[in-house]
Amino acid sequence: AIGHLENFSSDDAILGALAKGGLGDAFMQLNQPGDALGFYESAIAHNNNEYTTPKFLYKAGVTAIELGQSEKALQYFERIKNDFSDSDEASTIDAFIGMAKSGN
């Protein structure tokens, strides 16, 4: 899957972000959260939209917590709360903000 996604190219902003995020998911499955976080960050930067951005901000935040990067996680979670308050991810984001603030 990684080889196919790395070679994927699309002019569509959402598909491009989904491909980068898919690479992040693949690296999480391989227990390589550092690599996964890089791809989630790439997916976030690829295109700012209401569909993929909060999804990958959430995944990046959870991954950052796993890596012990609570401050980074807090930034991702607060961006969801502030910029994507209508997203599905925002419905439970306060709990994740609390987790990041507590350093867990």
Tell where the protein language model's regions lie, with residue ranges:
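Extracytoplasmic/luminal low-complexity segments enriched in Pro/Gly and acidic/polar residues
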Residues: 89-104
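Short solvent-exposed coil/turn linkers within tandem alpha-helical repeat scaffolds
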Residues: 7-17, 44-53, 80-93
